[in-house]
Structures are given as structure tokens and as C-alpha cells.
Amino acid sequence: EKAVGNHPFCVILPDDFIHAQHNHNVSRLVEAFQETGCSQLCVMSVNGPDISKYGVVEPGKRSNQVYRLVEKPSLEMAPSKIASIGRYVFTNSIFESIKSIGVGHGGELQLADAIDRLARNGKVEMVLLEGSRFDCGTERGYLNAILNLADRRKRVRENTLEKDIPILEASKYDKVLDMVDENFFTEKTF
């Protein structure tokens, strides 16, 4: 709070890796903030039970308005398929919101709860993600990011993946990812 003072600021969560042809998602958030003065969330559509891994937006009446943000709801309780991901622009009002919330999901202070409080005052909007998002906060997600990005780079694909891991070409990673379980990344593996 002392570092940013009264200035708006960006928050980028490091376990959300975003790959886009033009890396401008944060710029789009900043531009939207400059137009409206509202805090901004980067969002994406999530189908099925994976929605319970995210803060989920209940859209407001205005275009791009966030009415509510619900932290990790069940599929049945999710207000939409719009998930907040780790890119934000906030005004300094987020700090008062954080101070006013109690312990939330998982017994921790949740940024989503603070955002929800701001949203209920009509001060939060959303910008749709452009590109692909990878959850590098899990071993499986991290491996998925590595394999997908390597496959996009012709030189890496030709010199490594197609020679050393030929199963990838036929399966598009599913077989490799299915071989990965919670024990794959233990010290015994290496």
C-alpha cells in the first residue's frame, strides 16, 4: 500500500502463465482502467467442474461490469462460466476492501472476497483474455505449459519432441499428462 500510494497498479499472479501472439492483456486492462476509472479483471470462459478452481464472475447490467465475484464455487453454485485469472489493475481502494474482509475460503484472506466487495459498489469491470492460459501452480499444469509452448516452436518440436518423445505427435500430450501423477515430481524421480 505504501509502495503505490494513491496510484492505480497492476497485479500479476506468477502461477498464471499466459501465452498470446501479442502480449497485450495487461495493456488492455490498463486502457480499460484509463477509460472507466474502475478496477479491472482479466477473465476467461471455463466449462465444467474446473470452474470450482477459480473466482467466478456474476456479470452486472453494464457491458463488462462485474456484479459479484465468488471464490471457488461448486459447479452448481457458479453464477456464470466467467473465471477471473491472475491479471488485475486496481485502484488503491482495494486496500480498504482487503482490510474490511474476514478470513475466507481455505481459512485465508482471499483477494476474490476483496474484489467482490468492490464489485458490489459497481467499481469493477472485466476484460476477456486473449491467448492461452496455463496454471503453472500445479506440476501437471506446468508440464502442460512446457509441452504446449515447445510444440509451438518449430525448432524445439523438430529437435526434441518429435525425436525424443514421439508419443506426443499422436496423442497431443494427453498420454504424457496421464502418466503424470502427484508422485511424478518427487525427488525420487530425478
Model-derived segments and spans:
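A short, flexible beta-alpha/helix-coil linker loop
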Residues: 16, 75-76
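Conserved beta-loop-beta/alpha segment of the NTase-like Rossmann-fold superfamily
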Residues: 1-59, 90-92, 97-101
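A short linear-motif detector with a strong N-terminal bias
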Residues: 19-22, 34-38, 66-69, 105-106, ...
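Short glycine/serine/proline-enriched coil/turn segments at secondary-structure junctions
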Residues: 48-50, 76-79
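Conserved alpha/beta core of the MobA/IspD/sugar-nucleotide pyrophosphorylase nucleotidyltransferase superfamily
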Residues: 6-8, 59-65, 72, 79-185, ...
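Short, well-ordered turn and helix-capping elements at secondary-structure junctions
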Residues: 44, 70-73
